[in-house]
């Protein structure tokens, strides 16, 4: 165990922390999000049927709801999929090796070094496929341990005790994920609904206990309420978690009040703005607040830095659907590096601010401490 201390666990093995480089702390390379599919309705079908006009031969007015659900992303349905990304089955799976390599090669070409792949139990985690990507491109991939939302894990954990869940998380970190020898380098993303379910509370407590045994950070998927992060933080604190190594993800779709952001930051946890590039006027999964623009994200982070929380911030894209990949008309894994960092500099971010967000904070969080 002592050989792990001070190093970072990647999919290919332990690396020195200075090998990490520019890091996106919350991404998915392979994922199956079909549990969260919602069937389109008749009104949406009418909106998506593009008539070709008399004699054009291009009319798709006979399209059915099943067609709309199953058809591949194209120029014709691209906007509808962006607006209703949970209603197209093709969109809800990242499962194409060739495209994964192409997309992440672009990330590497733009200066990226490390992807934290936080797909966990219940949503199609695939360490062997991720290993192939890492080997092909020579980029670092850090895998996640633990359990996602109750909807995806109840079949696995309903009869498990907190201790059994804790032991399984530790096994994924110290021995290997599933039937592989590939070890996780972070706990999470740990799925939390709002309100929390009993299984999710067990998962949180198990994750806190596993952190004490592995020396890893915890990455949280909070429920969609501005009060959810503080409730989760309290449960983790009561269970012995090191809050300075707890990352509250999806902050940008969860808290839009600067005072609540500051209250959350005061706990010592890490605030993760991980939905850069997702700028939609309609957020299918709802919640108390909508989806902000990248400009809003940049402004909120800047305010947090000015309040002294520059070492408590990490960023990412959380790509988990095809429509956000460049191959399907989206922004891809390089959006932050190619578009956002220049905008941050124009906004007034210093080089130190940016290096902390992209390199130093991830390095500290991913370094194993026991």
Swiss-Prot record:
Cofactor: a divalent metal cation
Reactions it catalyzes: N-acetyltaurine + H2O = taurine + acetate
Residues that hold a divalent metal cation 2 according to the record: 189, 221, 250
UniProt keyword terms in alphabetical order: Cytoplasm, Hydrolase, Metal-binding
Gene Ontology BP term (one): catabolic process
Protein location: Cytoplasm, Cytosol
Annotated Pfam families: PTE
InterPro entries, A to Z: Metal_Hydrolase, Phosphotriesterase
One annotated GO molecular function: N-acetyltaurine hydrolase activity
Cofactor binding remark: Binds 2 divalent metal cations per subunit.
EC number: 3.1.-.-
Highest taxon above the source species: Eukaryota
Binding site for a divalent metal cation 1: 26, 28, 189, 318
A single cellular component GO annotation: cytosol
Family in the record: Belongs to the metallo-dependent hydrolases superfamily. Phosphotriesterase family.
Record's function text: N-acetyltaurine hydrolase catalyzes the hydrolysis of N-acetyltaurine into taurine and acetate.
Protein name per the record: N-acetyltaurine hydrolase
Record lineage: Eukaryota, Amoebozoa, Evosea, Eumycetozoa, Dictyostelia
